[in-house]
Design a protein with these regions (language model features):
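S-adenosylmethionine
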Residues: 1-286
Length: 286
């Protein structure tokens, strides 16, 4: 049975290969692209990280010097260096311009950091930090002026499986990107308000709003996918949130709730490209 270190190693390498798949594939030539293909992809990743290949039969056709030579040539081509499809490079160049697009795609190719939001209905930041320290999880407060003093996210220093922790199971915190934690405060919510989250997804922002509202009032969370709303309901139960109800976002449901809320949150679906840091496989599916 694999231990935590083994799982992190395997998962990290798989994500790396998925993220840089096109770049790695472009370094292969001839028979390398058809014979023991996945071994060849692994070999490229191994070589470009500076390791020596083991003397395995599957690597017999791989020449490290050739791989490095082709790599140096290919990284002069942005779509290969960034390991993105042609269509994505064309759209990015058109919308951002060359200089900004290169910054953007470089950022999207970085591994995403992990942030958590303290559930103020159950805990304080200091308590969560103390509990996590006892569970061997190191954190630091995000000291950014964009966040209120009481609303600062915690950054997880070393990526680990947080869902197995007692503090997570007890609903003391939620995993949520730092940028996402900026949204709910902008609504200037007050306890007792009626709020509609019309593109709720799995409910990260709805749960945050419930905390700001001190679990008083009502939040109607809507989405087109029932499975996401089911996950929201599970998260709400764990967090001790009682004011969220869910509904499939149909035309009838929208008309029924027309002009009935104090606040409306629309985190509308967009290109979906912002997920590439966490889900690099998305660029091969769009």
């Amino acid at each position: 049975r694999w231990g935590a270190r083994d799982r992190r190693f395997i998962a990290g390498n798989i994500y790396d290969i998925v993220r840089w798949y096109r770049l790695y594939q472009s370094c292969l030539t001839g028979a390398q692209q058809t014979t023991n293909f996945y071994y060849s992809i692994f070999a490229v990743a191994h070589i470009l990280k500076g390791f020596e290949l083991p003397q395995w039969e599957e690597f017999a056709s791989i020449n490290s010097s050739d791989i490095k030579d082709v790599y140096q040539k290919n990284i002069k081509v942005r779509k290969l260096k960034a390991s993105i499809p042609d269509w994505l490079d064309e759209i990015g160049l058109q919308q951002f311009g060359e200089k900004e697009w290169e910054k953007e795609i470089n950022a999207l190719n970085q591994e995403a950091e992990v942030f958590i939001r303290v559930n103020s209905l159950k805990a304080t930041t200091s308590k969560v930090q103390t509990d996590l320290t006892k569970e061997n999880i190191e954190t630091e407060i995000v000291n950014n002026e964009l966040f209120n003093q009481q609303e600062k996210p915690l950054k997880i220093i070393k990526r680990q499986r947080l869902q197995q922790l007692e503090s997570y199971k007890n609903g003391l915190f939620e995993v949520q990107d730092a940028a996402s934690q900026l949204v709910a405060p902008f609504l200037q919510l007050k306890p007792g308000m009626k709020v509609i989250d019309a593109c709720a997804g799995a409910g990260g922002k709805a749960l945050h709003m419930a905390c700001i509202m001190q679990n008083k009032g009502s939040i109607l969370a809507m989405d087109v996918e029932r499975k996401k709303l089911d996950e929201l309901e599970r998260r709400a139960q764990r967090a001790g949130v009682r004011i969220i109800s869910t509904s499939i976002a149909t035309k009838e449901a929208i008309l029924k709730n027309s002009a009935s809320a104090d606040r409306l949150l629309l985190d509308v679906p967009c290109s979906g490209l912002g997920v590439l840091r966490r889900n690099p496989d998305a660029k091969w599916k769009l």
